[in-house]
């Protein structure tokens, strides 16, 4: 893309209803937010347990800054790895029942790290068609043979695995799919990984803190295997920022030595790491929050049942697929006029003709807020 092509390119995106603009939040995250000077009820964040503004987390972060300062100042392999980082990794590993864990600045960085460190030229990686962009980018950057199987189609995956002669194989999936909210069949995927001597890499960005009593999708299914690599983010249900990878000790040691997005970057602020313990305690004690979330999910599914918008999601992500980009943008604008913030999601984030509004539920929402939103969203279909 040349300099002279930028403005016309942006104009083309605008004409196709695909120009992205940032909204400026002027309040803490929550069910009610202030954006560009106006108050809205938000169904747009991934703050599933409502912890992003929890007093205990805010206090832990402040205390961490008082103890460790504002920045880490170096990469983990120089002088950026503090006791706060070490204790956070130990706590995270114990929480999800693995030998070791490694902190990353983001889930994107973690996904690139794991995939590019374990497979390369001559190897093969097998990815679900609906995987997050960061998983796809990791697969592409690895230079391994990148094969995509139909969404949650175990027979198709097994065929690809059986036909592959690659010495190292890696299966990469989202545990909860970010745009549809449905879940990967993890037990069956692990069985295939065992059968074909493959790694199973699970991105549980949207399951950690919510599923399996908060310990995530692998815990929900009682899965334990050294070939299962578990990644979760700390910026969604956990209320903080960053991510971690958990697995057997040799795996984590390998990543410390080979993962470029771990080695060649400054460590995340130690104050964030210092707050991880408080986050895990809130998650462990968050049974009532998860029950409230289940009630909201049930209500949403009940309201959408029998409409063209009913889906397969039993998680906090409830997609409302409208098809065209223009219709999605128009509906989002209508909701904003009524005081609801539910942004339109358009290609390439979702497939062509799959534009949607993604209803993201939080334990902080009231049933009345959800009902009022759905009344507005379903009105065109009911009229």
From Swiss-Prot:
Its cofactor is pyridoxal 5'-phosphate. Pathway: Cofactor biosynthesis; biotin biosynthesis. Gene3D superfamilies: Aspartate Aminotransferase, domain 1, Type I PLP-dependent aspartate aminotransferase-like (Major domain). One of its GO terms (molecular function) is 8-amino-7-oxononanoate synthase activity. It is an enzyme of class 2 (transferase). Pyridoxal 5'-phosphate binds at residues 107-108, 178, 206, 233. Homodimer. PANTHER family: 8-AMINO-7-OXONONANOATE SYNTHASE, CLASS II AMINOTRANSFERASE/8-AMINO-7-OXONONANOATE SYNTHASE. This is 8-amino-7-oxononanoate synthase. It comes from Chromobacterium violaceum (strain ATCC 12472 / DSM 30191 / JCM 1249 / CCUG 213 / NBRC 12614 / NCIMB 9131 / NCTC 9757 / MK).
